[in-house]
Amino acid sequence: MSFWHVLALLIIAHALADYPLQGDFLSKAKNRRAPIPGVPWYQAMAAHVVIQAGFVWIITGSAACAVAELVIHAVTDDAKCCNRISFNTDQAVHLLCKVAWAYVAAHTVP
């Protein structure tokens, strides 16, 4: 697939995984600064980033990109939840990662 095709798929997947597939519960539960009683924040964060990383793996075929997505997405979302970065910065980091994964996927020989 071309860079633009992969990038479009990654952006669509990101929109799905960061909004309807995350939902209100995971969005709140992953915040360690305002935890939901009885719900370990790290389990909610793990569920969210595994969904994100899974889409990256399925679309790019790259386990390395998926692992990088998992780690970077978790760190970025935690920084947003802890008010160290803004929502817009969070989304910009996510989209820059998608550009990187699309580049890797488009330039990797199958």
Description of each model-found segment:
Residues 10-52, 70, 74-110:
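Interhelical loop and helix-boundary elements at the membrane-water interface
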